[in-house]
A protein has these predicted regions:
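Conserved class I S-adenosyl-L-methionine
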Residues: 1-42
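Conserved Class I S-adenosyl-L-methionine
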Residues: 178-244
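Class I SAM-dependent methyltransferase SAM/SAH-binding core
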Residues: 50, 55-100
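Short alpha-helix
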Residues: 158-178
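Short conserved loop adjoining the S-adenosyl-L-methionine
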Residues: 100-106
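Conserved beta-strand signature within the Rossmann-like core of class I S-adenosyl-L-methionine
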Residues: 133-146
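A conserved beta-strand element that flanks and buttresses the S-adenosyl-L-methionine
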Residues: 112
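A short, conserved alpha-helix within the catalytic core of class I
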Residues: 118-131
Length: 244
């Protein structure tokens, strides 16, 4: 690893336990619904499968039974150690960065990458496709809203726009692909005190108390409705005679 990759590895090693806790707390059946869709489309089952930037193996429990040889690659050794506890005997773990893995020229029937922070330019999608013999699957969160906090938050996550950039690039390159969106909803109870403490540094006291009153009224608890949307881009990578 070069210095930059080593720094990234150390960052994700330190964040691994917290990252896994966040994944475990998620109420959404994302991995199960994605697996069912891939079965429906005939992408699963498959022989060889690469889960690149696979982290702690969020998709592993749902995907591994559909795959003969499952390779989970990540730059973080600690992430891989956590993922190993979820693995069956058909899973191989690879401690390697995305760039180094692409350089190896290895081939997999299906290449899958979910919420990959290293896939930060559309051109890298093309590079990822070089690893695939049949399908390259890119999966990301594209929208996240809730009823209590989102209306007042101005900053947006730039990564939510990455999928639109990937699609624009693929269209420009005249590469075929199809997409599928997955919608999920959940609700959680938020206390008046939590809402107040969340915004106390953003708003003056009069504005804060006015909004607390408008939202909660005489109630101490309010239900916060969450809506998230994930999107899949599926890129066929089979070579045709004209490609040779």
């Amino acid at each position: 690893m070069n210095n930059n990759e080593q720094e990234l590895a150390e960052f994700w090693d330190e964040f691994a336990e917290e990252y896994e806790e966040i994944q475990q707390e998620s109420p959404y059946p994302i991995a199960r619904e994605l697996r069912d869709f891939l079965v429906q489309e005939g992408i699963f089952p498959c022989q060889t499968f690469l889960d690149i930037a696979g982290g702690t193996g969020r998709y592993l429990p749902f995907f591994q039974e559909q795959v003969t040889e499952y390779t989970l690659a990540d730059i973080s050794q600690r992430m891989l150690e956590i993922a190993e506890a979820k693995a069956q005997s058909n899973v191989v773990f690879l401690h390697q960065s995305q760039e180094r893995l692409i350089e190896t020229g290895k081939k997999f029937q299906v290449v899958f990458s979910a919420m990959n922070p290293a896939l930060d330019t559309p051109e890298k999608v093309n590079a990822l496709c070089q690893l695939s013999e049949e399908w390259c699957l890119i999966f990301r969160l594209v929208e996240e809203q809730d009823s209590l906090f989102s209306p007042f938050e101005q900053e947006s996550n730039p990564q939510l726009n990455w999928m639109a950039q990937y699609k624009a690039f693929l269209k420009k390159e005249q590469r075929p692909f199809f997409t599928k969106k997955f919608f999920f909803e959940a609700s959680e109870a938020i206390s008046k005190d939590f809402f107040r403490s969340y915004f106390e540094e953003q708003w003056s006291v009069p504005i804060l108390e006015q909004r607390v009153q408008e939202i909660f009224g005489s109630h101490e608890i309010k239900q916060n409705q969450h809506t998230i949307i994930y999107e899949l881009i599926a890129i066929p990578c089979k070579k045709t005679t004209s490609d040779d």
